[in-house]
Amino acid sequence: MQTWGEVPSDFRGCSATRAEAYAQTQTLIWQMQEKTWLARHPLGTSSMHQANILDAVRERAGRRRGGVAVFDHLRPRQTAHIVIDLQNGFMGHGQLAEVPMARAIVPNVNRISAALREAGGVVVYLQHTIDEEAIRTWPVYFEHFCGPEHRARMIEAFAPGSPGHSLWPELDVAQQDLVVIKRRFGAFVPGSADLHARLQQRGIDTLIISGTLSQVCCDSTARDAMMMNYKVFFITDSCATLTDAEHGGTLSAMAHTFCDVRDTQSVLDLIAATR
């Protein structure tokens, strides 16, 4: 079977000119297909998740604490907006780890960052990073959860300095914001990042979680943060993953035990209420 971009067998052994012509034709076809896809699915306009907390979880939360909401206020100067893995490798069309719905959350992420920054809070961008240290210290993941081909492509995509490792250009990153390397899914486990130390230096006790993927890095970071005694808000429409089912499952798990789960406008209202 011919694979994409491979010269068919009847072209092999032909003159270089004929083979090159075939390759050029295939490239033009791919470019036309890409333009058609982008016209139908413009970057930054992917659909938002249609998912929410399970009714059973809402009922249990109501019995435990009176409702899904956990906190009735926040103090912006003690709060950090943690923006997780919104990098080209997760955001760009056709990228290895593309999460189309992650493009749709960027306006909400920027709104939260702007409001918190203006109110005196901290904005942190975490970058999923695969470098020599990550590979050396986390062999269980790289050797058992990734096949050889996928592992090689992920290393290439998220190596420091690679295009995929860079933050998505539509994010409104300010000069005072922090950009932190993250070598595990969760940002607080040993060997992942120096996030906890940086937050403690700034007197941060509350986190707002945004980013991708909802059920992997956002989930892992939020769970560990709560168990390290941070107050955690998990934002329904500024986190994204590949399917509504995965997103909804994460919201339910977070709301059950770990986080105050609410939407962008609700957390913006909490920030505004402090002024």
Identify what each model region corresponds to.
Residues 89, 131, 241:
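Active-site loop signature of alpha/beta-hydrolase-fold enzymes
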Residues 83, 124-125, 179:
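Structural recognition of the beta-strand scaffold that forms the well-ordered cores
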Residues 77, 95-116, 121-125:
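A short alpha/beta connector and helix-capping loop motif
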Residues 134-148:
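Aromatic- and acidic-residue-enriched segments that line the glycan-binding/catalytic groove
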Residues 80-90:
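Acidic-leg catalytic submotif of subtilisin-like serine proteases
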Residues 121-128, 134, 235:
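Short beta-strand segments at enzyme active-site cores
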